[in-house]
């Protein structure tokens, strides 16, 4: 992407629109202007097929978030971007998110990932809601929401997550206390990944895997590697037309299919076990989302499998990386860490009595997670394929156009978030703060918001709650971490963390 990021700017002069952004729900009183045609919109310089070649040559686009951010600085708050056979519009101001929300149809459309679709078509698998548009998407989504996204569902699976989070903290504490100094310096990332798999598997399938022990299940470790391979190959294939990449990237397609094969096998084994237990009439108790869906019996088994696999694949990296970046920010902002610790200690008795209270008793910790996702959004864009003509930044956007909101730039806009480079969770709680005027968009909006958002939120909330009340978290690293785009935004490297037990 550096090829076009360094290209000559098409529009001369500094761009000041970033510093005049308005929060959602406000309107400027400027006189109306004549709407400009779509063709007049600034276009990202460079050849669309050269971009495909660049992605193929670099085996991805790791700096996409930075390149797009720079393009906004050069071209203004809206621009056209073409890559290969795809045409899209990028925006980054709150007012444009609001317009997209207002234009939301009954069946919000978004671009479907060609590599993921290609695998399912080749293997004869049904698609889950992540890979559907139209009436079938809406029907399936409305049937999934009660057992995955609703507040009653959250109340059912929160105690399961709490048990895993407590085990994580106790296991870590045992390791720390083996050291005479009462502290331990380590790479915590593998443990956090195991936690997210352990918690998500329990919530989905009602099954503990034993990943928090010293000798974790090899199948689950292979599952982590399969996810990494799937995400990496997705980026390398998603922008290149399949008719071209089948010749230029045949080994990458093979790696992509093999990764999905393992993910499907992993999930299918768990679903089959639950199905057999229910068929045998085992005594019922809440044992996860899949069992609830099977007992509800308003979706076919194949549909349940398709959506469970989407949730399984999307429940690990997308939760682990925000947890790791939150630990990093708290380690280099000890005053914020202490405020969060005090909140957790005050609320501990009530949360211990009823883990569901964590979602209401820890407002500052919830704000810290919002702040992490503002700076490091796992998904760098939100997108909609608009169903009707609309106007964004005074340009006509024809129906059918794919519009992408770059969350990375939106979260770092000083007109929306004061001192955007600083880690300041309190901004989300201040009555006059930017966070109180602007919604938290990391999980999307409307009917197409992330189906697993409540699972992810409670997994992050409870792990941090139990870690903070038991440990001081420190790091020698104070410099910003380089983030890379590999289908999701992730740190290129992570520093070592020191955990000091609190007696």
UniProtKB/Swiss-Prot annotation:
Subcellular localization(s) per the UniProt record: Mitochondrion inner membrane
Q: What is its main location?
A: mitochondrion
Mark out the transit peptide.
1-24
GO biological process entries = aldosterone biosynthetic process; cellular response to peptide hormone stimulus; cholesterol metabolic process; cortisol metabolic process; glucocorticoid biosynthetic process
Q: Which cofactor(s) are needed, names only?
A: heme
Q: List its EC numbers.
A: 1.14.15.4, 1.14.15.5
The protein's superkingdom reads: Eukaryota
Reaction(s) catalysed by this chain, per the record, are: a steroid + 2 reduced [adrenodoxin] + O2 + 2 H(+) = an 11beta-hydroxysteroid + 2 oxidized [adrenodoxin] + H2O; 11-deoxycortisol + 2 reduced [adrenodoxin] + O2 + 2 H(+) = cortisol + 2 oxidized [adrenodoxin] + H2O; 21-hydroxyprogesterone + 2 reduced [adrenodoxin] + O2 + 2 H(+) = corticosterone + 2 oxidized [adrenodoxin] + H2O; corticosterone + 2 reduced [adrenodoxin] + O2 + 2 H(+) = 18-hydroxycorticosterone + 2 oxidized [adrenodoxin] + H2O
Protein's membrane topology: Peripheral membrane protein
Protein name per Swiss-Prot or TrEMBL:
Cytochrome P450 11B1, mitochondrial
This chain's source organism reads Ovis aries
Q: What is the lineage of its organism?
A: Eukaryota, Metazoa, Chordata, Craniata, Vertebrata
């Amino acid at each position: 992407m550096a090829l076009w990021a360094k290209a000559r700017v098409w529009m001369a002069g500094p761009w000041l629109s970033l510093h005049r952004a308005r929060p959602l729900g406000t309107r400027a009183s400027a006189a109306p202007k004549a709407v400009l045609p779509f063709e007049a919109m600034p276009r990202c310089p460079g050849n669309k097929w050269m971009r495909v070649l660049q992605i193929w040559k670099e085996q991805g686009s790791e700096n996409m978030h930075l390149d797009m951010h720079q393009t906004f600085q050069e071209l203004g708050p809206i621009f056209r971007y073409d890559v290969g056979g795809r045409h899209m519009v990028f925006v980054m101001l709150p007012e444009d998110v609001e317009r997209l929300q207002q234009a939301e149809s009954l069946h919000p459309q978004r671009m479907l990932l060609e590599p993921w679709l290609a695998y399912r078509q080749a293997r004869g698998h049904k698609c889950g809601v992540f890979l559907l548009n139209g009436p079938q998407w809406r029907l399936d989504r409305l049937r999934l929401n009660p057992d995955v996204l609703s507040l009653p569902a959250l109340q059912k699976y929160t105690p399961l997550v709490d048990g895993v989070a407590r085990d994580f903290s106790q296991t870590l504490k045992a390791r720390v206390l083996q050291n005479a100094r009462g502290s331990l310096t380590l790479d915590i990332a593998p443990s956090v990944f195991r936690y997210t798999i352990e918690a998500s598997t329990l919530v989905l399938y009602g099954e503990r895997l034993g990943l928090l022990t010293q000798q974790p299940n090899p199948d689950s470790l292979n599952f982590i590697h399969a996810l990494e391979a799937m995400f990496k190959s997705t980026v390398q294939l998603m922008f290149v037309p399949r008719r071209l990449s089948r010749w230029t990237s045949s080994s990458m397609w093979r790696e992509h299919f093999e990764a999905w094969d393992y993910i499907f096998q992993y999930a299918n084994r768990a679903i089959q076990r639950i199905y057999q237990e229910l068929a045998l009439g085992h005594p019922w108790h809440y044992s996860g989302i899949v069992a609830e869906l099977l007992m509800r019996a308003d979706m076919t088994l194949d549909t349940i499998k398709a959506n469970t696999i989407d949730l399984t694949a999307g429940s690990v990296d997308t939760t682990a990386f925000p947890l790791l970046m939150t630990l990093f920010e708290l380690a280099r902002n000890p005053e914020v860490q202490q405020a969060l610790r005090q909140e957790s200690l005050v609320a501990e008795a009530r949360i211990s009595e009823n883990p569901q209270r964590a979602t209401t008793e820890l407002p500052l910790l919830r704000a810290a997670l919002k702040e992490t996702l503002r700076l490091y959004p796992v998904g760098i864009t939100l997108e909609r394929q608009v169903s009707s003509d609309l106007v964004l930044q005074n340009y006509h956007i024809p129906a059918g156009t794919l519009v992408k909101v770059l969350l990375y730039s939106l979260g770092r806009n000083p007109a929306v978030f004061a001192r955007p480079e600083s880690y300041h969770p309190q901004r989300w709680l201040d009555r006059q703060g930017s966070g109180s005027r602007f919604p938290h968009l990391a999980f999307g909006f409307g009917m197409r918001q992330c189906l697993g958002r409540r699972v992810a939120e409670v997994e992050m909330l409870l792990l941090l709650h139990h870690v903070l009340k038991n440990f001081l978290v420190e790091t020698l690293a104070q410099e910003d971490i380089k983030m890379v785009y590999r289908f999701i935004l992730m740190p290129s490297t992570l520093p070592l963390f020191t955990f000091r037990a609190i007696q």
